[in-house]
Amino acid sequence: MAAKLLLLLCLFSGLHARSRRVEEDENEDSPSNQKWVLAPKSQDTDVTLILNKLLREYDKKLRPDIGIKPTVIDVDIYVNSIGPVSSINMEYQIDIFFAQTWTDSRLRFNSTMKILTLNSNMVGLIWIPDTIFRNSKTAEAHWITTPNQLLRIWNDGKILYTLRLTINAECQLQLHNFPMDAHACPLTFSSYGYPKEEMIYRWRKNSVEAADQKSWRLYQFDFMGLRNTTEIVTTSAGDYVVMTIYFELSRRMGYFTIQTYIPCILTVVLSWVSFWIKKDATPARTTLGITTVLTMTTLSTIARKSLPRVSYVTAMDLFVTVCFLFVFAALMEYATLNYYSSCRKPTIRKKKTSLLHPDSTRWIPDRISLQAPSNYSLLDMRPPPPVMITLNNSMYWQEFEDTCVYECLDGKDCQSFFCCYEECKSGSWRRGRIHIDVSELDSYSRVFFPTSFLLFNLVYWVGYLYL
């Protein structure tokens, strides 16, 4: 009996041990318990040993070759995009990859690996240049999904450090030719604390490259190209090497042509309609003139909204102002015509040299005769003809129209340049003078206004676009 119990116990122990071995084998085959090897353990250990050795006695507060020679920084810039450009704030936005390369002899190492590619965690452990963008208003480094920084160390001590930046940089726009202006917007950088005796920047060959312009947000500008320069700037703290990239931009005129130039031209042309309206239609001509003046005022206000409050006159300001003057002059033309064509009571003009006061002892005219064409009838619907007044063998012309007589200006008033009616054209004052018939002012304006406006446009567009 005891022998049977011992046999059963041995069988149970064997089965239990076998089941445990099967479970262990299954656990070893499961993916969660497998160990993935990304690199040989010896190489991983080699990189760690190299970094530990390089940083063991490294002082990141000191620049390379301090006290021996200046540190040379080679610069590369890759432009992702430019824009938008703000004329009001005098700034533009740019997205770049900024790369700096220099040599640090303290980071030389001997290994089968030529390059150590590291992430942003190593940036704070070594010395990097204190580069600043001198004309930046705001700047932002990209951190999604990780800090957009790259660090590479060569075995000869050369270091490459790149990062992605979005910068709002200042651009002093000269708007004298606006909106036909072109600008060179700079991006300027230098060392913050190291003068040229300690740090020198220089451009690498083909150091500035640009991405495809389809994604750029230059809504009102065309990108014409870029150029880079190097200069020495003297300050109270020393002489600094300053690097500058100029982005050449030319403004597109399409938006301003539609929004400002065409409406202004059409408003000026509309004001000329007044010259073909009868001069006695005072409400119509006055309403048209005031409406066009107010329209030009509104267009002028809208045109200035896209500009900063500069103290000088821009090309658009000049055009809008001249258009306003043309519209205002058209309104004043009718005011002048209406004033000098006013209807007055019938009077007989007397010659100053012929008539005296009744109390005077000199002679008084004793014969006045009125003559009119014999074929004119009171029932005639035509305008009344001119009537000749004979006063002591001196003739005067009066224009009768609807019982109104248009009184000629006195001789002393006519002696300047303007002549109202036929009788004003007689006399010694007309010798060598210009004679303008005010009653024909509309006829003159129909030619003068379009011609002068056409000449102005010719000079304006040729001067700003080609000179």
UniProtKB/Swiss-Prot annotation:
Residues 18-256, 304-311 are extracellular. Residues 278-283, 333-446 are cytoplasmic. Disulfide bonds join 171-185. The keyword Transcription does not apply. Keywords: Cell membrane, Chloride, Chloride channel, Disulfide bond, Glycoprotein, Ion channel, Ion transport, Lipoprotein, Membrane, Palmitate, Postsynaptic cell membrane, Signal, Synapse, Transmembrane, Transmembrane helix, Transport. Glycans are attached at residues 110, 228. It is a multi-pass membrane protein. The keyword Electron transport does not apply. One of its GO terms (cellular component) is nucleolus. It catalyses: chloride(in) = chloride(out). Its main location: membrane. The chain crosses the membrane at residues 257-277, 284-303, 312-332, 447-467. It is found in: Postsynaptic cell membrane; Cell membrane. It holds the Pfam family Neur_chan_memb. Expressed in brain. Heteropentamer, formed by a combination of alpha (GABRA1-6), beta (GABRB1-3), gamma (GABRG1-3), delta (GABRD), epsilon (GABRE), rho (GABRR1-3), pi (GABRP) and theta (GABRQ) chains, each subunit exhibiting distinct physiological and pharmacological properties. Gamma subunit of the heteropentameric ligand-gated chloride channel gated by gamma-aminobutyric acid (GABA), a major inhibitory neurotransmitter in the brain. GABA-gated chloride channels, also named GABA(A) receptors (GABAAR), consist of five subunits arranged around a central pore and contain GABA active binding site(s) located at the alpha and beta subunit interface(s). When activated by GABA, GABAARs selectively allow the flow of chloride across the cell membrane down their electrochemical gradient. GABAARs subunits share a common topological structure: a peptide sequence made up of a long extracellular N-terminal, four transmembrane domains, intracellular or cytoplasmic domain located between the third and the fourth transmembrane domains. Belongs to the ligand-gated ion channel (TC 1.A.9) family. Gamma-aminobutyric acid receptor (TC 1.A.9.5) subfamily. GABRG3 sub-subfamily. This is Gamma-aminobutyric acid receptor subunit gamma-3.
